[in-house]
Amino acid sequence: MRIQIALVAIAVILIAGENLEAVADSQSSTEDSTSSIVTTKPTLQIEAEYAKYGDYIGLTPVDNQSTEFSQRIVKDIQIRFVNNKDQLLDDKGQPIKGRTQKEFIIGLLKLKPGEVFREDLLKADLQRLRRLESFNEVNVYRQEDANSVNLIYEIKERDFPSLILGGGSNEDVGLFGRLGYKDENISGLNDKLDTTVQISGKDVQFNGQFTSRYRPQEPNRLGYSIRAFRNRNISGTFNEDIRLSNGDKVREGRFGGSVGVLRSFDEWDAAISLNYTRISLRDREYNVAQVDRLGSPLSVSGTGIDDLYTVLFSVSRDQRDRRENPTQGSILTLSTEQAIPIGLGNISSNRLQGDYIQYLPVSWIGNGRPTDNPEMLAINFQIGTIFGNFPPADAFNIGGLDSVRGYGYGKVASGQIYGLASVEYRFPISYSIGGVLFTDFASDFGSSETVLGEPGVLRDKPGSGFGYGLGLRVKSSFGLIRGDLGISDRGELRFEVTTGQRF
């Protein structure tokens, strides 16, 4: 069983305002799935519909009267912050001060003062703010007359910075302690710092990344990201079925960093980065190993160490209703990574990948009940291929908690090409507990034979695999805890626990 626990503070509180017409409810699921709004005009009744977690659907006339709407202008936009007690004022009667700069928030909006009011732009702006990791909850209200509209955003921020303490044990390094620091809103501009240090009796591992996001209000300024990392684990490609000549399992170490720039174009986010990774294969005492027990090479260079210098370009389109535990929408990510033949191994390759996720709300058994685990279908498709020569440790390892459940990590295939399809039916059990029925299928399309040393073929990995099962999702102070019981098409049964949704 692999257990990963991260401390995440999640608070869900509904905000309502007097004399304001609500056009979207909060991300909280504590409200019913519909609510009615009646305008002050006597000739028309307007109803606003809401999905769980506050996804704004729109305004729909409920009678057959013909009505003319004037082109009302957005007169003013106000930003208000609320605290964890759902209050706009502090104990001294002063407005709550948020960390986020109000100019930054307004700069993210498409609907600005002086422009013609449009429902579709308001919906897009609301979803854009809800996808920011620094915000826990976003509401928008409007005040309007015949000619103008005032928009009032009420925002509850997440509790950052946060300090994460943890520890555990694994078969590679034994007992370890972990310290993490995370801030998603540095300088009030949603800049991000995420660092983790893990210390054990065998080594020190770390992962640190700073990201300054692209800001639409500063179109001539590019965002940027800097990362450094060092980690080691049991190899998923060279697993325990064939060990080293001394009987040890193959350990895989990775050390490196990256520097990238970020830019957004309409609804697309793009990134290009320069990356360096040194991959080394080692035994239990972390001595470099060149071949396994059968004499098969572990690296392209033949030394047990390969250097990867790459240029990565990726684009993504995020249309989820929110970033964390989304309830509807989709996200598409496409990437290409070109390796430059420098360093050990002289590696020249191109790695292409695509990832698509769709969230579809359904109402088969939930009946609109308030819940933190709304009923829905979640669908994920992935595909990838590598052209050229590449380290066998960098093959696509299929199988495990984040691919085909019911199999161990890398137990389905280690291939040059892969395709993956997953479907989950998520449904509420109680307010904070949800259930999941899932199925996963993946294949290497026969490409394991083209990987250097054929590690997947020699270890009798099937090349394709199917898994299904059920799981629980529990909303807790640690975040969303996921427990999945998977059954493989070979009859293997595995129960694993981690945090966060599978996708």
Report residues per predicted region:
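Short beta-strands and strand-coil junctions in structured, solvent-facing domains, enriched
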Residues: 87, 114, 160-162, 187-188, ...
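Bacterial N-terminal signal peptides that target proteins for export
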Residues: 1-7
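Transmembrane beta-barrel strands of outer-membrane/channel proteins
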Residues: 165-169, 179, 193-199, 224-232, ...
